[in-house]
Amino acid sequence: MIRPSQLTEAALTASKADECIVLLTETSEANLRWANSTLTTNGHTTTRSFSVISVMQGARGAVDGPSIGTVSGNGADLDEVYAVVAASEQAARQSGPAQDVAPLVEGSAEDDFDAPGATTEIGVFARLADELAAAFRDPGAGARQLLYGFAEHRVATTWLASSTGLRRRWVQPTGTVELNAKVADDLTRSAWAGAYTTDFTDLDFPAITAEVRRRLGWSQRQLELPAGRYETILPPSAVGDLMIYMALTMEGRTTHEGRTAFSAPGGDTRLGERLTNLPLTLYSDPAATGLRTSPFLATSASHDSASVFDNGVPTHRVDWLSDGTINALAYPRAAAQELGGQFTPPPDNLLLTGGSSATAAIEDLVARTDRGLLLTCLWYIREVEPTSLLLTGLTRDGVYLLEGGEVVGQVNNFRFNESPIDLLRRTREVGATQRTLCREWNEWFARTAMPPICVPDFNMSSVSQAS
């Protein structure tokens, strides 16, 4: 069998473009699913994606700049590789000049470039399966409880090769587990918890199970509340969903064009503006413990925060907010040069630190709340107005009423309307940062570490009948 590294070399050898970049990603994935407190399915798949980026100098005239063509396939064999290379060259000839041109990154081959792709197998869930079996045998306190959920482990190996001599390889493991518990006699009573892991060896599944059972216990008393502004504690998962939305809009070009909440009049930006008096730092870091990401940029398509010309550029820590101040925007190299910014790669993980109560657990925030709400997670989040980053969405799987520092019952779900930028400004207390799994974004953005936060006036704009 031809190794992935050999396929990338074959593509570069076949290329007739002036310059060429080849990306190949091989993904090994195992999954486990359960429902009604019974294991239902498991599976293992291996997939491959293969992209060729051809760069043609003056393809449509001598005065034109370089044009690019990107074509993807699955890299099944050499015939397909050659077909993708030819199609990429044809696409480049038919394209107009690229707007994000920068010199391709030079380099040499890493020692592990010829190594095969890393893999996973169904055995990664061995301990989890035993812990699930024990949880299935435990009916839970009070009414009988049913467990539903899904565990997934993906190991993606990426090879990046360029006509400049650059050869890079990266292995990205991603593991997630989501657990939903319901009361057998009333399936509208539901609780959720999730976790991120790289290899399932550090997963505390009994603690996850205990948490959803605790929340189901809180739902024994059902209450109705109207829409309004409530003091609200958001757990790390919900905070993560909101911070991801914010970070992904922190793009240099769109901000200079006046199209984001970080824009200022006259084509300027809000860089340097204090967003909150709390010493909060929101950052991405490829070397973050337990949340590591690729140390180099790899993308098969250009967009406002990344460019195919930047493939192979080293990534680095970026403080998007620094001690409460807007500190960075994402710029490809070409946009940075044009707009007077600094090359800044887009985030692939996200951490929020520096809270007012940096050692406080969510239980501590609850104990200090006279009357308010405790959320489980957010769902179906959509952007309403980009220049203020106003978002709308729904609460899900448990909203709990707090009185006198204790949970006294479960209330109805709500639709909310909030901007994460404005939320940070109004946040009263921030607890300890911990690794978490967001609910809405976890399929695309799983690596986050967030604190719980307390907002004195979270806008529950209407009651939701969803359950």
Where are these regions (language model features)?
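Dual-mode signal for accessory low-complexity, basic/Gly-rich regions
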Residues: 249, 267-467
